[in-house]
Amino acid sequence: MCVICGVRPATTADHVPPRGFFKGTVGQFKTVPACSPCNNGSSADDESLRNYISAQVGKQTLGAKYLWEMGAHKSFLRSTKIRSALLSTLQEVEVLNANSSAITRLAFLVPVSLYQRVFERVTRGLHFLHTGKILPADIPVQINLLTDAPDLSSPEFQIFEKHSIAEDA
């Protein structure tokens, strides 16, 4: 049974989270049983989301730089459609810098429905990996965009078990 939709028979294995999010990472990634429409029908969404996340994060860390250079940047160069989707929403916005002075930066609209589709699939896959049970389709998975990055060292996050998704990730 497909752990993503919970309806069709599983005929493939889907990487959870998407392998394309971890460019340069080696090893066997975690997979879950999935039907072909849920797995193969999501490749374009996975690539698009990787590109948006990479464009948001930039090259702040070595991993983010590698993801940009080996993944998102190549996608933007290769595909006019991908490039146009991002650039069509690009606009200048005023933000406050560390000194509370207004400065102009470039911003783009984040396609919330894209995040919803990909992260719902990932959530359903991770639920199966951790519990061995399919999350019923009538249980909603809601994605909320954060205004800033959470402190992952806080006690609320320390209660979660840590698992590797590949050899070096």
For every predicted segment, state its role.
Residues 30-33, 44-45, 60, 65-72:
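Glycine- and acidic-residue-rich phosphate-binding/metal-coordinating active-site segment common to enzymes
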Residues 47-48, 81, 85, 114-117, ...:
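Exposed alpha-helical structural elements
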Residues 38, 51-67:
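A broadly used, surface-exposed interaction patch
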Residues 101-169:
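C-terminal, charged low-complexity interaction regions
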Residues 71-112:
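Short flanking/linker segments adjacent to small metal-binding domains or redox-active Cys/His motifs
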